[in-house]
Amino acid sequence: AYGHVMFLRIRNQVDPVSRGFLVDDFDPDFPPLCWACDEARDQGGIVIWCHNGQGMEAPIAAVLGKLDAFNLFDPFWMDPEYDIWYKLMNCGIKLPASTGTDWFICSNNRVYVQMDEKFGYDGWLEGMQKGRTFITNGPALFLNVEDKGPGDIVRFRDDRKVNVRVSWRSHYPINRLAMVHNGRVVKRRNFREGSYEGEWEAELPVDSNGWIAVRCNGVARDSYNQALYAHTSPVYLQNGKQNPYQTKDAEYFLKSIDKSEEWVRHTGRYTNDDQRNAVMEVFEKGRKAYEKLAKT
């Protein structure tokens, strides 16, 4: 119910590996995942939220700054997870895109990281933390906004237009390409016959803090019969004016916290009230953060 996380570059196993009904019908829903995230971070680890954007602790861990990346298309496209990711970024949370194949599923899902140095594990992880990624099961997709790439910040004053450049190459043809600004598709291109490579340049009006990303998909299927897709991490926009969707999306997460706390109070299984209260405290920290964002 809380969700699922993945840790990279940890020196010691973070226990417990699993709790609740995945262990047995009587195992307690304790401790919360945020505690595990803290333990991994204390070891210098990287924390990635995995294929469960609807897990109760996802918005909590994100707003409290415990996540380095957010898995999507893991193991397949699920609209609600993208919607949650978009809403989190509208709240000003910088959250790079990652992906994977899940533990028992074979697929072509991969996250690619742009690096500034010779390839190496630590440099790759640093690039992921900086948000210099795109996720894909085939197409290579690249984004440039005012000469800035994914993970970078475009700073500006007042209202203006920004130059957005997109390029792609794919072994199988893509059929749809979309520019996404603050979670809304603002420009799109359709390729009825499919496109294997190309470039696209456009001007987008911007007037507030926010983000721009690009995504593509196609009717072709990869070798595991999944529809073709790719999505970049965002380029962030910053001019000091609040993202127009911040209040609404922060309120969305406040409502989700209401439901989560109701579950903790009446459905969650705990050995004693101290455990239940400790979990409630984690959700209350998240609530305070979103209340601040909703009122800003």
Describe the role of every protein-language-model region.
Residues 1-93:
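Catalytic cores of extracellular degradative/oxidative enzymes
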